[in-house]
Curated annotation (Swiss-Prot):
Enzyme Commission number, as recorded: 2.1.2.11
Pfam families assigned to the protein according to its UniProt record, in alphabetical order: Pantoate_transf
Subunit comment: Homodecamer; pentamer of dimers.
Protein name: 3-methyl-2-oxobutanoate hydroxymethyltransferase
Annotated source species: Chlorobium phaeobacteroides (strain BS1)
Keywords in alphabetical order: Cytoplasm, Magnesium, Metal-binding, Pantothenate biosynthesis, Transferase
Single annotated GO MF: magnesium ion binding
The record's free-text note on cofactor binding: Binds 1 Mg(2+) ion per subunit.
Pathway(s) per entry: Cofactor biosynthesis; (R)-pantothenate biosynthesis; (R)-pantoate from 3-methyl-2-oxobutanoate: step 1/2
Localization in the cell: Cytoplasm
Broad enzyme group: transferase
Reaction(s) catalysed by this chain's protein: 3-methyl-2-oxobutanoate + (6R)-5,10-methylene-5,6,7,8-tetrahydrofolate + H2O = 2-dehydropantoate + (6S)-5,6,7,8-tetrahydrofolate
Top-level taxon: Bacteria
A GO biological-process term: pantothenate biosynthetic process
């Protein structure tokens, strides 16, 4: 779908996401980590752009999300916000709070959430976890900072669980996740990411809570969907889980373009006369 980059649509807010849930309008969310990609996503009609701590993997080359720092997250967030502002300024921008930026205490979490919000013009922060972060979520939302929750597979706890397998298959774990979803809503979270959980459980959570659910590997019954931009564009050829649909093969496109450039340079075919001054 082609969209007019000059079209000024209302900025997506937490209220708008609630309206979308109530009206049955699906929410489209993608990650971005840089200015150029954010411009394209905003122009393309993406509702929510997540500056995810997945930048640790796909941008910095780490094996997990744990090494990324709050300073690095803010750096990428600033670039994304500038990209959105350069286009239609429609997309909501949500920033992941990185590992150990909110786990030590509610006071430190509040300080770091405030730093993220003050250092760039983002719309909200995202935090992983259930009951263990509920008090912190309430503390942060009470001062006016919107928080998106994240349940199911929570990558910041990968060493605790030991794998990236589907979560909450067993009844006890499913019941706990459902309770956590309700607790997060009561604490003031405006939306929930549900990652790698059974589709029927995601549907139950979506029916139970009044806030939007955004799935990744959680079936089609969620109020919206999110993917890592590198995965859906085919930039990460080694990673192709069941829940990722590839909409392009940019790895191949970039490879062909670069090898073509290298050949032209080595053969003396670039630059041509009309590419010179």
């Amino acid at each position: 779908m082609k969209r007019d980059s000059g079209q000024k649509l209302p900025h997506v807010t937490t209220r708008r996401l609630l309206d979308m849930k109530e009206q049955g309008e699906k929410i489209a969310m993608l990650t971005a980590y840089d200015y150029t990609t954010a411009r394209i996503l905003d122009r393309s009609g993406v509702d929510v752009i997540l500056v995810g701590d997945s930048v640790s993997n796909v941008f910095s080359g780490h094996n997990t999300t744990l090494p990324i720092t709050i300073e690095e997250m803010i750096y990428h967030a600033k670039a994304v916000v500038r990209g959105v502002q350069a286009e239609t300024s429609r997309s909501m921008v949500v920033i992941d709070m990185p590992f150990m930026s909110y786990q030590l205490s509610s006071e430190e979490a509040l300080r770091n959430a405030g730093k993220i919000m003050k250092d760039n013009e983002c719309d909200a922060v995202k935090m992983e976890g259930g009951k263990v972060v509920v008090d912190t979520v309430k503390r942060i939302t009470d001062v006016g900072i919107p928080v998106m929750g994240h349940l199911g597979l929570i990558p910041q706890s990968i060493y605790k669980f030991g794998s990236y397998k589907v979560r909450a298959r067993e009844q006890k774990e499913a019941e706990e996740l459902l309770r956590d979803a309700v607790l997060l809503e009561q604490a003031g979270a405006f939306a929930l990411v549900l990652e790698k959980i059974p589709a029927d459980l995601a549907a139950e959570v979506t029916r139970t809570v009044g806030i939007p659910t955004i799935g990744i590997g959680a079936g089609s019954f969620c109020d919206g969907q999110v993917l890592v931009i590198n995965d859906m564009l085919g930039l990460n050829t080694e990673f192709h889980p069941r829940f990722v649909r590839r909409y392009a093969d940019l790895d191949g496109v970039i490879f062909d373009a670069v090898t073509g450039y290298v050949d032209d340079v080595r053969n003396g075919q670039f630059p041509a006369e009309d590419e010179s001054y």
